[in-house]
């Protein structure tokens, strides 16, 4: 049994009820500026010129990676460890690293004044649904989603479908 030292009772209850937990400021600031510093160069676009934004969203490949425990702030990492039941539950090399494989959502003019309900959203998927899962398969215990910038209303954030999470 895990002895909770970092998750508050409210966070524990929220995770059990909803199947997810928001941890603000979860990214170690040491990685924000260096990783975001060359983002627009990698994209081949200019942040100050929307005419160069040629796609609504792009997925960039990973160029750099660090162990999750370095990438996360200590608060975020210790809460992650408690959620999964202890550090011994993490495979020594699979699922241990996070990198700069950004998914960038540029949006378009339409979304400035239009809302989209979850049922209208495209791209619904189940993570790791492209291979047969086993109890010791990677990526099945907990998915970490990091936001590198604020996500304003209509800003293209990730929907989480609680009804699809068993027990959620």
What are the residue ranges of the model-derived segments?
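Eukaryotic N-terminal targeting leaders
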Residues: 1-2
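Non-heme Fe(II) oxygenase catalytic core, chiefly the N-lobe of the double-stranded beta-helix
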Residues: 7-10, 15-18, 27-168
């Amino acid at each position: 049994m895990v002895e909770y030292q970092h998750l508050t009772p409210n966070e524990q209850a929220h995770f059990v009820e909803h199947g997810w937990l928001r941890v603000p400021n979860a990214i170690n600031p040491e990685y924000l500026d260096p990783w975001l510093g060359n983002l627009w160069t990698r994209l081949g676009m200019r942040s100050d010129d929307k005419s160069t934004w040629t796609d609504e969203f792009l997925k960039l490949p990973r160029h750099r990676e660090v162990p999750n425990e370095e990438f996360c702030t200590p608060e975020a990492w210790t809460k992650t460890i408690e959620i999964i039941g202890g550090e011994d539950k993490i495979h020594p090399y699979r699922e241990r690293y996070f990198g700069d494989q950004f998914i960038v959502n540029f949006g378009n003019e339409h979304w400035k004044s239009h809302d989209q309900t979850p049922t209208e959203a495209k791209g619904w998927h189940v993570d790791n649904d492209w291979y047969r899962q086993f109890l010791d398969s990677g990526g099945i215990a907990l998915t970490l989603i990091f936001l590198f910038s604020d996500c304003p209303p209509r800003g293209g954030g990730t929907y989480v479908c609680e009804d699809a999470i068993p027990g959620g």
